[in-house]
Amino acid sequence: MDKLSEFCSKFVENVMKMTVNQLNKVTKELAKKITIDSNFKSVTDNNSVIESSKEITENKVIEKLEFNIILESFISSQRIKLIKTLRDLISIGLKEAKDLIETLPKTIYEGVSKEFAEETKKTLEESGASVIITENII
């Protein structure tokens, strides 16, 4: 594979990993920086290609989810264990962790992957916390 083909392949892979919001921003930036002659005919001028593109985008929106992790409550007898877990988990100091659990419910992570959200929930629940994971469709 030549260098241009390899570059294009990697570019497409990276684009496919992007969220709809990210794609929208990239499109706007490209529109600002690239001027295309009005006589230029692209593949997207074909309605069937546009429709399949819409289907792919709609499917991608459903697949691309981000999650928020909300710490709701905790077992008071495990307060110290939870404070230690929070300090390690979200890299905050002792006072910040103590203040955080005194003002529940609190969102401790926003826009994280499903796997990360589930692992974090498990860790917090092992420390006596009650945790909710909410999803955001991007």
From Swiss-Prot:
Which parts of the chain span the membrane according to its record? none
Q: Which Pfam families match?
A: Ribosomal_L12
Instruction: List the record's Gene Ontology CC terms alphabetically.
Output: plastid; ribonucleoprotein complex; ribosome
- Ribonucleoprotein: present as a keyword of the record? yes
Q: Where in the cell is it found?
A: Plastid
Respond yes or no to whether keyword Aminoacyl-tRNA synthetase is given for this record.
no
One GO term under biological process is: translation
Record key words, sorted: Plastid, Ribonucleoprotein, Ribosomal protein
- Subunit comment: Homodimer. Part of the ribosomal stalk of the 50S ribosomal subunit. Forms a multimeric L10(L12)X complex, where L10 forms an elongated spine to which 2 to 4 L12 dimers bind in a sequential fashion. Binds GTP-bound translation factors.
* Function text: Forms part of the ribosomal stalk which helps the ribosome interact with GTP-bound translation factors. Is thus essential for accurate translation.
Can you say what this protein is called? Large ribosomal subunit protein bL12c
> What is the organism of origin for this protein?
Euglena longa (Euglenophycean alga)
Which lineage do the record's taxonomy fields give for this organism? Eukaryota, Discoba, Euglenozoa, Euglenida, Spirocuta
